[in-house]
Each structure stands twice: as C-alpha cells, then as structure tokens.
Amino acid sequence: MDGPTRGHGLRKKRRSRSQRDRERRSRGGLGAGAAGGGGAGRTRALSLASSSGSDKEDNGKPPSSAPSRPRPPRRKRRESTSAEEDIIDGFAMTSFVTFEALEKDVALKPQERVEKRQTPLTKKKREALTNGLSFHSKKSRLSHPHHYSSDRENDRNLCQHLGKRKKMPKALRQLKPGQNSCRDSDSESASGESKGFHRSSSRERLSDSSAPSSLGTGYFCDSDSDQEEKASDASSEKLFNTVIVNKDPELGVGTLPEHDSQDAGPIVPKISGLERSQEKSQDCCKEPIFEPVVLKDPCPQVAQPIPQPQTEPQLRAPSPDPDLVQRTEAPPQPPPLSTQPPQGPPEAQLQPAPQPQVQRPPRPQSPTQLLHQNLPPVQAHPSAQSLSQPLSAYNSSSLSLNSLSSSRSSTPAKTQPAPPHISHHPSASPFPLSLPNHSPLHSFTPTLQPPAHSHHPNMFAPPTALPPPPPLTSGSLQVAGHPAGSTYSEQDILRQELNTRFLASQSADRGASLGPPPYLRTEFHQHQHQHQHTHQHTHQHTFTPFPHAIPPTAIMPTPAPPMFDKYPTKVDPFYRHSLFHSYPPAVSGIPPMIPPTGPFGSLQGAFQPKTSNPIDVAARPGTVPHTLLQKDPRLTDPFRPMLRKPGKWCAMHVHIAWQIYHHQQKVKKQMQSDPHKLDFGLKPEFLSRPPGPSLFGAIHHPHDLARPSTLFSAAGAAHPTGTPFGPPPHHSNFLNPAAHLEPFNRPSTFTGLAAVGGNAFGGLGNPSVTPNSMFGHKDGPSVQNFSNPHEPWNRLHRTPPSFPTPPPWLKPGELERSASAAAHDRDRDVDKRDSSVSKDDKERESVEKRHSSHPSPAPVLPVNALGHTRSSTEQIRAHLNTEAREKDKPKERERDHSESRKDLAADEHKAKEGHLPEKDGHGHEGRAAGEEAKQLARVPSPYVRTPVVESARPNSTSSREAEPRKGEPAYENPKKSSEVKVKEERKEDHDLPPEAPQTHRASEPPPPNSSSSVHPGPLASMPMTVGVTGIHPMNSISSLDRTRMMTPFMGISPLPGGERFPYPSFHWDPIRDPLRDPYRELDIHRRDPLGRDFLLRNDPLHRLSTPRLYEADRSFRDREPHDYSHHHHHHHHPLSVDPRREHERGGHLDERERLHMLREDYEHTRLHSVHPASLDGHLPHPSLITPGLPSMHYPRISPTAGNQNGLLNKTPPTAALSAPPPLISTLGGRPVSPRRTTPLSAEIRERPPSHTLKDIEAR
C-alpha cells in the first residue's frame, strides 16, 4: 500500500494494515481495484469505489471496486497532496455546492457513476477545478466527473458526487429509515434529505467524534437513540462484523456495505463509512478522493475521505505528525469548508452545515452516541479487530478523519485534528467500538493514547501524553479491541446506562449540549473518545448541575444529577446554596459563579478539568479509565464521596457552627447590647470560620439560607434568628468586624453579614432608610420585618444578610448622628473647620446610614455603634433636622468654599484627583485625619469610617478638600492616616475596589472596612468609592443605597453585576445617570459642595427620595463642606459656575429628580416595606455573589462591607462607614465614583457615563 511511503511511523502501521487490505482486496476483488492500475487505475479505483458507493445506492457495484478504490486514492494522495487539499476544497465545495446538484446526482448517480468509473482520468481533469471546480464540476462531475485533471480530485469529486448520490440515497435511507440512526436527520431531518443527511453525517462524524465516520450516520444516530442505537448497532455490528469479517477481503467489505447500503440504508452507510474509512486509511493517499465520496456516501465516509486526502498525503510526509498533518490539513480543510460553502453551498452545507448540526445535536447526542458507541464497539468488535489490522490505515484514516473532523468541526477542532475520534471514526462503529473495542484501537488509544490524537496531543494535554501510545494503538488497540470484547459487556452495560443517562440528561441538557458541542468536540477530538467518555461521564456527574458548564453538561449531564443528588442532599442547605444558591437564583452571573465555585469545581475538578480528566484517564489503565470513567459514579465516589463527606460535614459543621455562633451571638448580644466588639470578635470566628469550612461564606450563607429563617431571620433580626434576637444586629456589627477579621471567611460568613444585615437591616439598614427600621433592627422587630423579607430574598439571594449589615452602621451612625446633629449645629456655628468636623460626624452618620449594611462600626467602635444604634432613630431624626438645616448652610458654605477655594483647590484637587498628589493630599489628608481624629474622638464608633470616608473622599475630593482644612492642625496626627490614605487612595485609583479599602485602612485602624468599602459600602461612602466605585465600587455603596432603594428589583441584578460589588450589578441605569447621578448627588454632597448643593438644592430628589440620605449628605457636607467646598469649589466651582456644570446640573437635576422620584418611591417602599427586600436586594448580590464567586461572596458582604470587612478586618468600620453611603448612594444613586476624586466637572462628565469619574479617579 502507498500508506507506508506516506506515513513513516504511523504509516507503517497503515502499511501493514494496508497490505492486509490489499490482500483482502486481492481476495475480495483486487482486480476491480487494480483495474485502475497506476494513478489512472487508482483514480479508476476511486471512481469505481465511488461508483461502487453509487452502486451501493443503485446496485452494489462489485465490492472489488470498493476495495480497489481505497488503495488507488491513497496513491493519488501521495501523488498530489496539495491537489488533494485542493480537491478536498473542491470536493467539499462540490458536495456542498451540488447539494442540489447532489440530489440531481442522486438521479444521475448510476450513469454518472458509470461515467466516473469509465473516465477516472477525465475526472483528474477536474483537478483544475479543485476549489472552484466543485461548484462548476458539480454537474460536470455528474455528467463528466472526468473533466478534472487530478485523479484525486476526480476521484474525490466523483466520490463526492457518487458519495453524494450514494450518500444521498443512503442519507435518505438513513434519514428516512434510520432517522433514529441519523441524528442529523433528526436535526435536519430531510431538509434536502441528502443535504440533511450530509450534514447529519458530517455532524455525526464531528459530534460523534467517536463513531461518526464509518459508523456514520446510522451508527452515530444509533448512539443517539438507545433502543434504535441497539437495533442499529446490532445491525451495524452485523454489518460491521460481516463487513469487517469481509474486511480482510476488502471486496467483501465493499460488497457487504454496498449491498447493505441499500439493504440496511442507515447501517450500510456505517459499514460503508467504516469499511471505507478503514480502506481509506489503508489507501489514504489513493482513496482520499474516493473517501470523501465514501464519507459522503455514508456521511462518515465523506468526512473521512475529505480529511484523508489531505491528511493522508501529509501523513505520508510525517508519519509521526499525522495529527500535525491533520492539523495542518485540517485547517486547510476548514478553509475548504469555508471555501466550499461559498463555492458549493450544498457541499458547504454538507461539511460546514454538518458542523453546526454536529455541534447542535451531536454534542447532546455525542455523549449518548459515545456511550452508545461504547457499547456497540463491542458489537463492532470484529470491525474493531479488523480495524486493528488496518489500524495503521485507521491511524492514517483517523488522521485524515481528524483533518476532516477538523475541517468539519473546523470551528472547534480546526487545528485540532481532534476528530481523531473521527479519524477513529473511519469506522464510526469501530469508534464506538473504539470505546470498548475501538477504544482499544481508537477510542482507548484515542482517549488514553489516541493514535491520531497522539499526533495532535497539542490540542489537549492528555492527548499529548496519549500520543506516545500510538504504537499501542495498532498493537494495543487490537488487544484492546479484544479486551473490548470483555469490556463490551461492561461497555454494553455502560452504553445502556450511559445512553440512558445521556438520553435523560441530554433531553434535559439538550440545549446545554448544544453549548458544549464545540467544547465536547474539542474534548472528543483531543481526548480521544475514551477521554471524551471519561469527561462525559465525569462531567455528566460533575457538571450536570451547572448549566453554565454546558460543555460538561452535555458530557456529564447525567452523572451530575447523582452527584448533586448525593451531594446536595447531604450538604443541601450548605452546598445547595453555595452551588445552587448561585445557581438557583438563576441570576445571569450564576453560571460563571458556579464554575467559579472552586470547591465544586474541584469536586468536579477531579474530572472537571479536561486535562485532569485526560490525566486521570491516561494515568489509569486504558481500560480502567473507561471503566472508572464510564462508571464515573465510582470515580466520583472516590472523589465525590470524600468531597461529599467533607461537604456534608462542612454543611453540618457549618450549620452547627452557625447555630452555635448564632446562639453565642444571641447571648453576647443580650449580654452586650452595646459591645459589638465582643460579638463581632466572636462572630468573625464563627462566621468566618464556618464560612471557611464551607466553600465560602456563600456556603455558610447558603447554610443560613438553607435555614433561611434563622440565617435570614438572623440576617434580618438576629443573625442566628435575627428577628428574635436583639444581638443579631450587634452580630451584624460583629459580622462586619468578623468580615474585616476574615475577608473571605467574612464573605463566607455572609450569614454573619446576614446577622449584620439583620443588625444593619433591622437596626441600621432599615433605619438608614427608616429610623424605625434602625430601631427595629436594634430591637429586633425590624429584624423580623427583615427576616420576613430576608427569608424570601435571602433564600433566593442571600444578600439580605449583607444588606442587613448596613443597618448596624445606621445604629452606630444614629448615635453618631445624634452626636453629629449636635456636632453639625456646633460645627455650623463653629469655624467651617469645626463644621467640617461635625460634617465628618454627620458624614459618618450618613455614611453609616449609607453603609448601615456594613457592620464596620462594630470593629472600630462597637460600643458606639450600639449606642448609635440605640439612639440611631433619635439621632437620625435630629441628624435629619440638622442636615436639613445644614443642607442649606453647607450648600452656601460649600459654595463659598468652592468659589473661594475654587481656584486653589481646583488645581490641587484636579492634580490630586489625577493621582492623589500628596502635596495637597498630605495637607488635606492631615486635615481630614484631624477631622477624623476629632470625629473618632467624638464618635469613636464605626465612624472611623467617617475619617475613612473623608480620607476616601479626600482621596477623591473630600480628602483633598478636607485635607487642606484638616491638614493644618490635625495633619500631624492623621498624617499617618493621610499618608496611608494617600496610598490607599492611589490604590483606589488603581485598584478601585482595593484602594478605597486601603484608604479607609489608612485613615481607619481597621482597613478591612476600607476594603469593604472598596467593595461594598466604603466605596460609596468614601470619595474613593467615587473614583473607585465609579461603576462598581461606587455602585457598591450606591448599590447599597440603590439596593435599599431598589433592592427589591435590583437585589437580583446586583449579584450579576456585582463582581465584588454586587451593587454595580445594580446596573439599572441608576448606576449610570439616573441612579448614578442621584448617588453622585449624595457623593457630590459629600465631595462636591457644589454638587451637594446642586443635589441638595434638588431637594425633591434628596428630600423626597432620601431625606435621611440627603441629610446624611448634608451632614457630610456640613462636616466636609469645607473639604468638599474647598476642593469641589476649587475644581468644582468652575462647574458650578460653569455653564457646562450648570447645564449638566440642570440636566442631571432633572434626571436626578426623576431618579429621586423613583428613588423616593423606592425609598418609601423600601423604607417601609421594601427595605427588607431592599436589604435582601442588597444581600442578593452578595448572596448570589457569594454562592458562585468568592468576590461575589464578598459582594454579598461587600455591599454590607461584611465581605469587604472580612477582607479588611480593620476597615470594617470604614466599610460600615462606607455602609452608610448606601443611603447616600440611595440618594446619590450614582456609584461612589461620583464621590469625586476628580473635579465636579469631571464628576458631572462622569456622572452620565459612570466611567469618566472612575477613570479619572483611577488616574
């Protein structure tokens, strides 16, 4: 056989097999094949083979022509590899172009078949039409296939046409009689039955990377349908057995398939494809042209021939690189696919269209088919053995099929000749055999040591490792083929089991399967079929639950249910929420979250990683992997049971830990209504710890969610059972401290956040929106209210716990606000600097209101936080009054400041905004630190965040504005903070999320709050949030407020949007101009005296939507009006005076008024009834975030600053401080970014885009 010359290493095997085939052909009817003698003889053989394919259709022509046709095509391939490629292109084009023509060819088949046989040389003439030829030559071929100059092209064209004609009848038969067999026919039942069949065959080849080619449509389809699979498999196996038995005499194969082609329409194509694939493998170079026809005849054969012509010629050159050749040629073939569709729509449909189909149904079915093929392979075991003889041919054919598959699945496997499955498809049935029988030959070898895959191991790491066994492929494959017999019973069982699973899972995951097809195709092609099966099984078990992991879904949809049935049931509350929580919420971001679910990814990861699976498969004995993988449950059992045990233990442990923790928190809360430190300290341990055991706080939260009443009642009222316990609010604060204690554990302990949320929610979150809620939070009545909303929301989103976190901030904020109310009056009376201090206090209060979800105050000033919580209602009311008064004064003051400092601060602030310049930054930071120190002294509670807010704000605006003021006396003290702030601010600018926390950390003893701020509240609370959270960070806090305001409807959105900042997910355009501008209003109030004045002047927005928030803003302005006025007047005054700014103000004001109207509705609803949901809305992001992503876990806390606090344990107060910003955010829906680090002009510019300020601040 010519194969030896073509493929040296691999080809040698083919040589032996091809020699065997030659013997068979000599026995069966070599004369017919030899009639072609030389290249012409080969062409003739090809044409004869093609015609024999046509004869199959009409009258099985001498099988000898079939055997002879394979050999001559191989020689032809050798003769002209490039021509083959061209022919392949032309061939593909011809097939596609002449899809209609192919139908015509079906009519013309007998005559044209004869003509083609008669004039194979004339067919060569068509070579000139290699690419364009297919289109023109379609009919030309039909009438004069000889016109092509290249024998290969001629043969290929003839084969294509004949194959089309034959294939069309076969396809029609398969489609009609074997629609069950022909998955493609199912997909494209008979849109042009031949066309549908071509596609189906191509798709089958592709999707059935295992047994598409020779097994072709019939067998592939058989794989698709279990019963029919078995029936078709039986018949195809009979055909294969007969054909393979006759394969030794190629004539027998040809005859049997040809006759069977007519007799067993769907099955014969399999045999035809299998036999031809084998024969083609043997006569890769000669038969490539014919092979395409054959592949097209029995869809699989068409796929094989097409690649083989290219691959085979290349295979000749590099036997070890057949895969590379295939890859190389596969890309050319894909181009032909591309070329063919344009030139030959029918052919293109045949190949590219089949690809889509292959991707569509084949993926879903490819698992079933793979499974089915796993079973039938034994049936086709004789074929597998026979194939093992021509394994070299198979390798060649497989490689060629790889090329073809690559071309066919050029999308997924262009460069991957990954269709080694298809290459093993040469006997599609054998490929299913390949799993059991061919598995040894092609599937095992493909999977563990893919002969073709070994060539393109590059495509996959496992294949790379697998390539070495190609020799095993020929020798071991045969042996494996025999073991396949023993495996067959197992595989038959597996086939039934897996087919059942696949059918069940595919029915459910058909859509998901469609998604995975490319992935599966790659996997199939890369990890030979066995690997695919392993992955399928593994993935089925592992990924079925995750629609987002659709590729695995298609592969492992079925096993996954058991895994989750076993796993979720055990860890139901825990993991279901972690995995399913993110997943059940059905949030758009969940699918990613689920894969991110590292723990489960790891659980599944044992088999999930394609590389890991291949490694597992490769590491395991060739057959074992199939057994293990096929019995994926077993594999999962070793891994999953352990995981399940830990998971179950984790779930139980976390649950118990949470219960204990809740109980302790209750006790502590009861014991220390004021001392949040103790509770938060405990809470971090329990909350952080249990979350640690759990995959994430998400899991714990899921746990809490699992016991949503407790968790979300706890989140709402007391963390354990928030409603009943007063401590939960403190726990909420504690949770925030816990959050800052353990950033991730914190996030993990979103339950803690839930408790914090209950605290923040009942006491702070709601109070931030509604003082009563704050009070209720403290008392626990609000908590119950929150619990009710939390339970619905928390179960769904688990974010409520984090949203409840804000209320605790309100608690401390309230104390501080009462103090701040006096401080505001006092500061108003006092110098503007004092006013800034009081503003800082009020800012803290407002920030706490905004960041009420953040338990941060607890870490810094837990007692104060409690005290604040106690007096939060009174303080809020006084603060509101004070802020109402201060709204005007700060406005004017800030106006004055902005105008007076406009020139000075405009440049300084701009420069600082550019990169937090420390020249003014230090002065401002010093002042801010001084104010912070004063504020901290006054309100030792979480208001540390106020400094943080100021420092963050100074980072954006306040820090810089307040820094000059504060910097004078307090600069020395706060310089540390200021410097740290500067660092943090820079980080703010660079790491939007981190910087805010860092700034907060710098300004505050607990940076975690800052971090929390960065993620959730602090961003909004902090000016940094303005810059950092421009979209997300700002959105975090704004989102907090937004969540509170719009949480009910935004609660879900935050999760998807909120990476770490669930709020950003509050992307309802509030983040942008509408809400964002309102948020910016608050931030502007804090940061931009003018902006604040502007926003506050828009009292309809502020007063109506968030009087509290606006008053908090006013307090911010009163506290930081100098800072803000200073800087903002410096660089904002231009805006305020700026017609641009005035215009923007007007536009934004209108927008904000509109938004505020919405917000008012939201506020009122949320304050009264929605607030719990709003808290939930807040939690949903984190909760949703927590389940899937750690960052999302943070977001859950992050909104609450719980996660942020967890990350930045020290900053939780800052986070809490930034927690109030949600209120501000509520008012200033704009993301924290509006908190201007940049001039108001920039802020205004950024307000609508929501990116400008972020970008500017980032700068």
Swiss-Prot record:
Residue ranges, annotated region (Important for regulation of lamellipodia formation): 289-472
Domain of life: Eukaryota
Biased amino acid composition, Gly residues: 28-41
Extent of Pro residues compositional bias: 331-345, 353-365, 801-810
Residues modified as Phosphoserine: S1198, S1233
Pfam families reported for this sequence: Auts2
Chief localization: nucleus
Region (Disordered): 1-87, 108-285, 299-470, 771-1027, 1119-1146, 1217-1259
Entry keywords, A to Z: Autism, Autism spectrum disorder, Cell projection, Chromosomal rearrangement, Cytoplasm, Cytoskeleton, Intellectual disability, Nucleus, Phosphoprotein, Transcription, Transcription regulation
Tissue note: Strongly expressed in brain, skeletal muscle and kidney. Also expressed in placenta, lung and leukocytes.
GO biological process: actin cytoskeleton organization; axon extension; dendrite extension; neuron migration; positive regulation of lamellipodium assembly; positive regulation of Rac protein signal transduction; positive regulation of transcription by RNA polymerase II
Gene Ontology CC: cytoplasm; cytoskeleton; growth cone; nucleus
Chain intervals with Low complexity compositional bias: 386-410
GO molecular function list: chromatin binding
Entry annotated with the keyword Nucleus: yes
Locations listed in the record: Nucleus; Cytoplasm, Cytoskeleton; Cell projection, Growth cone
UniProt biased composition (Basic residues): 8-17, 136-147, 1125-1134
Biased composition (Polar residues): 177-192, 436-447
Alphabetical list of InterPro entries matching this protein: AUTS2 (IPR023246)
Disease: Intellectual developmental disorder, autosomal dominant 26: A disorder characterized by significantly below average general intellectual functioning associated with impairments in adaptive behavior and manifested during the developmental period. Additional MRD26 features include autism, short stature, microcephaly, cerebral palsy, and facial dysmorphisms.
Oligomeric form and interacting partners: Component of a PRC1-like complex that contains PCGF5, RNF2, CSNK2B, RYBP and AUTS2. Within this complex, interacts directly with PCGF5 and CSNK2B. Interacts with the histone acetyltransferase EP300/p300. Interacts (via Pro-rich region) with PREX1, DOCK1 and ELMO2.
PANTHER family found in the cross-reference section: AUTISM SUSCEPTIBILITY GENE 2 PROTEIN, FIBROSIN FAMILY MEMBER
Task performed by this protein: Component of a Polycomb group (PcG) multiprotein PRC1-like complex, a complex class required to maintain the transcriptionally repressive state of many genes, including Hox genes, throughout development. PcG PRC1 complex acts via chromatin remodeling and modification of histones; it mediates monoubiquitination of histone H2A 'Lys-119', rendering chromatin heritably changed in its expressibility. The PRC1-like complex that contains PCGF5, RNF2, CSNK2B, RYBP and AUTS2 has decreased histone H2A ubiquitination activity, due to the phosphorylation of RNF2 by CSNK2B.
Entry's family note: Belongs to the AUTS2 family.
Domain remark in the UniProt entry: The Pro-rich region is important for the interaction with RAC guanine nucleotide exchange factors and the subsequent activation of RAC1, which then promotes lamellipodia formation.
Protein name: Autism susceptibility gene 2 protein
Species this protein is from: Homo sapiens (Human)
Lineage: Eukaryota, Metazoa, Chordata, Craniata, Vertebrata
